């Protein structure tokens, strides 16, 4: 018998079409006014506001942020960095994660499987000189790092922060 993910079932049962439409609209533009949001999803402003507050309280909406233009800020080099660890112990992973969490150049850090690496990082820096300083001055100095392989982005074809919600619609 297949395993049923109860958290997914609970989420599907809890979120109705208004909630899903609110989430979709807020993913497109979190600065939308409550009045405009209510009009777009077909509710009056007061219930719309209550639903947004409930979605925040329930943890569906984690926070609202501004998306910055990295190129205008001089951050023109993006690298995906694959990190191999010398030992696969909880202590080694915890140490790496605590150190890498302090690196502002690292936008994402994922523990991965299926490749010759333990972690994949997304790193954004101004240029190759800054990347070299980050690599040699910080990354390779982290205790336990045994290998580093970098791939550089030539052209970002898709960049989105919007999560797909279709699987939750009935």
What are these regions (language model features)?
Residues 1-170:
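A compositional/biophysical signature of low hydrophobicity enriched in polar/charged and small residues
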């Amino acid at each position: 018998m297949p395993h049923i993910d109860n958290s997914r079932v609970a989420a599907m049962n809890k979120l109705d079409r208004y909630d899903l439409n609110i989430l979709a609209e807020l993913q497109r533009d979190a600065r939308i006014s409550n009045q405009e949001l209510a009009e777009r999803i077909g509710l009056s402003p007061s219930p719309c506001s209550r639903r947004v507050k409930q979605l925040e309280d329930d943890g569906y909406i984690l926070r609202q942020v501004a998306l910055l233009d990295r190129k205008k800020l001089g951050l023109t080099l993006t690298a995906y960095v694959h990190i191999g660890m010398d030992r696969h112990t909880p202590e080694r992973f915890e140490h790496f994660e605590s150190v890498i969490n302090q690196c502002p150049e690292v936008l994402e850090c994922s523990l991965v499987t299926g490749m010759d690496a333990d972690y994949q990082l997304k790193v954004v820096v101004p240029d190759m000189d800054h990347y070299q300083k980050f690599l040699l001055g910080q990354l390779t100095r982290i205790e336990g790092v045994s290998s580093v392989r970098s791939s550089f982005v030539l052209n970002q074809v898709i960049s989105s922060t919007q999560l797909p919600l279709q699987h939750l619609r009935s």
